[in-house]
């Protein structure tokens, strides 16, 4: 029988608590708990694809949002900081999967994400 603290149940407990730390690190690498999001929302797929063509042609994301988005258009599509659980499923999955990008060089969802609200072109400006 091994002495207490060397092997046995004690080692298992230590390993289990160690894995808890790596779970936290994994969560942080997958996008943390909040994202700073901009989006362009269009009820019709065709209008959303028009907006995407404008972005691809070099137009700024915020300008396209102001022209095409049916939600928050006056703020250039800026939704601010959004936390996990505050967005609809497909939107949240896409937002946390995107890398951080800038207005001049946006990385966005292509094809647009479909939700109950319509079609979204999503861009992430920050993560925490």
Swiss-Prot record:
Location, primary (coarse class): nucleus
UniProt catalytic activity: [protein]-peptidylproline (omega=180) = [protein]-peptidylproline (omega=0)
Superkingdom of origin organism: Eukaryota
Presence of keyword DNA-binding: yes
Annotated Gene3D superfamilies: 3.10.50.40
GO MF term set: DNA binding; peptidyl-prolyl cis-trans isomerase activity
Spans through the membrane: none
Domain PpiC: 32-126
Entry keyword annotation includes Transmembrane helix: no
Record's subcellular location: Nucleus, Nucleolus; Cytoplasm, Cytoskeleton, Spindle; Cytoplasm
One Pfam family cited in the UniProt record for this chain: Rotamase_3
Region (Disordered): 1-34
Function noted in UniProt: May be involved as a ribosomal RNA processing factor in ribosome biogenesis. Binds to DNA.
UniProt protein name: Peptidyl-prolyl cis-trans isomerase NIMA-interacting 4
Organism this protein belongs to: Danio rerio
Gene coding for it: pin4
């Amino acid at each position: 029988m091994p002495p207490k603290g060397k092997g046995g149940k004690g080692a298992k407990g230590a390993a289990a608590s160690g894995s808890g730390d790596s779970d936290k690190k994994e969560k942080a690498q997958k996008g943390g708990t909040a994202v700073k999001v901009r989006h362009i929302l269009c009820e019709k797929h065709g209008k959303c694809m028009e907006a995407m063509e404008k972005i691809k042609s070099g137009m700024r994301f915020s300008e396209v949002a102001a022209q095409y988005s049916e939600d928050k258009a006056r703020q250039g599509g800026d939704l601010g900081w959004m936390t996990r659980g505050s967005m609809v499923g497909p939107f949240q999955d896409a937002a946390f999967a995107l890398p951080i990008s800038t207005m001049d060089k946006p990385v966005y969802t292509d094809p647009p994400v479909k939700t109950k609200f319509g079609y979204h072109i999503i861009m992430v400006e920050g993560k925490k």
